[in-house]
Amino acid sequence: MKKVIVIGCPGSGKTTFAEKLQKETKLPLYYLDAVWHKPDKTHISREEFDERIKEIFALSEWIIDGNYNRTIEMRLKECDTVFLFDLPTEVCLQGATERIGKGRYDLPWLETELDPEFAGFIKEFKENSLPKIYNLLEKYKNEKQIVIFKSREESDEYLEKIR
């Protein structure tokens, strides 16, 4: 486990898991939200985003936290390990709501409310995004170590095992 991606619905616990995994493995952690977003709440271009991701790929070790569905296959080709968070929608909405008002390493600003468009993305994740992710995982299942968490307890148990 040297090149890791952590994917799944926003609010599922990906970032918390990635941070704990980083502490255990000492692999450098990169947040896709921090790559994409600028402090003024705008974002870089897709081309620049792709170039920055490729710069991370060139490193010998990394954990990449985040979805950005357009680039999941690009990251799947480069990683050796995948952690997918497939948690209930209600848990993800609660997780996204609970982080409002808290500083985050992966965002250059403080969220003050749950954006309705973002909440809609979370509500539709299982229907719109997850099937595509599972199809990609099926494609790479013989080449990658794939771990799927259905609860935060499962991710906590995994971290306990690697201590």
What are these regions (language model features)?
Residues P28-V82, L87:
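Conserved nucleotide-sensing/catalytic segment adjacent to the nucleotide-binding pocket
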Residues V6:
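Hydrophobic anchor at the beta1->P-loop junction of P-loop NTPases
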Residues T15:
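Walker A/P-loop
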Residues C9:
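P-loop (Walker A) phosphate-binding loop of NTP-binding proteins
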Residues L87-S129:
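A glycine- and Lys/Arg-enriched "phosphate-lid" helix/loop adjacent to the NTP-binding pocket
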Residues E24, E124-R163:
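NTP-dependent small-molecule kinase module
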